[in-house]
Amino acid sequence: MRLYRSQIPRLAEDIIGTLALSGDIVVEVSLRPEAEQDIRAIMEEYLRQEHRVVQETREIMEQRQITYDQFGRIKGQVADSKGHPTGDDGIRWIVGQILENFMISKYIDEVFGEDRAMRRGIMGLFRKHLVEEADLDREVRSRLKNMRPGTSKWDIEYRRVMEDVRRKRGLI
């Protein structure tokens, strides 16, 4: 699953709305935007860290002249060295940070829900909002059936169609 910056506002709104509606947290209506902003800040900080890891990975690969097919392995090593969780672990980290924030936030009046139940609910919201990259890849490849993978023309078209699919889904 991948978190896109464009999904953050809707996701933060859904998290606060769902937990408030279920009675897990109490938030004054006038303070709701600030509570949502706290959640947005957590997700945006995660994306900033992710961006730093990707940039450092690219620099290392360029310095050592490593091919792009090793990107995932090198990124994992860089992320581990920085203590930055990736993939589903990253989502679990974000959820943990959100729950910790509820306990200290001046915009959340009261927390009644159990951590485990709220964690499960928030993870469900993330699954609903986040996009599986494999689904995007399948959709793009289905549109490029008439081209042979691996050619330069296919690579160019793949990137163009991927951008169109992401734009269509509101991810960019």
Task: Describe each model-derived feature in a short phrase.
Residues 130-172:
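Alpha-helical oligomerization segments
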Residues 36-46, 62, 67-129:
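Conserved mixed alpha/beta catalytic, RNA-binding, or beta-rich assembly cores of soluble enzyme
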Residues 27-31, 111-114, 136:
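Short, tandemly repeated low-complexity microdomains enriched for cysteine and small residues
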